[in-house]
Amino acid sequence: MVRFKKRYFVVQFDRERDSYDPLSNKDSFKKRAFQDSWPLHIKDHDLALAVKDIVEHIHGDFGRAAITTGLRAIYSNPETHLAMIQCRHGPHRLVGSSLPFLKSIGNEKLVPKLIYTGATIKNCFKVKDIIIFNFL
């Protein structure tokens, strides 16, 4: 029996802002994502479908076929705007290189920030807890 290795991505989403100035105050921008009153209402299926579409747009049919069998969104929190994506080892490089180009999920215009890429879901949940603890 063969074990399939997996990789996990921890991603934080923020609404796309037209007036964002990266030099103004970076700490307030990080904290604002948690303090906004808008919850992130996206379904895991919509997130996985958006990732598949952007990988196909960037890497073509090969990229879509490589990630289709092992890609799924396993966690999304509407309050902290964090999500976790699971992918097979190997094609995870295609997913990681395509995530910065993701601009919308469903009707939501979002800006993704790749926080962490890990081999175990346990480490991803540790990172998630650290992020929530530091910014709340």
Kindly give the residue locations of the regions a language model identified:
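Intrinsically disordered, low-complexity regulatory regions enriched in Ser/Pro/Gly/Thr
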Residues: V2-K5, A65-I67, Y75-E79, R88, ...
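Active-site-flanking beta-strand signature of metal-NTP-handling nucleotidyl enzymes
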Residues: Y8-D14
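Surface-exposed, low-hydrophobicity interaction/linker segments
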Residues: R17-I74, F125
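Charge-rich, low-aromatic oligomerization/scaffolding segments with amphipathic character
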Residues: P22, P91-P100
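Helix N-cap motif at beta-to-alpha junctions
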Residues: L82, Q86-R93
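A common structural junction motif
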Residues: P100-L110
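Short, low-order "capping/linker" segments at domain edges
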Residues: I121-L136
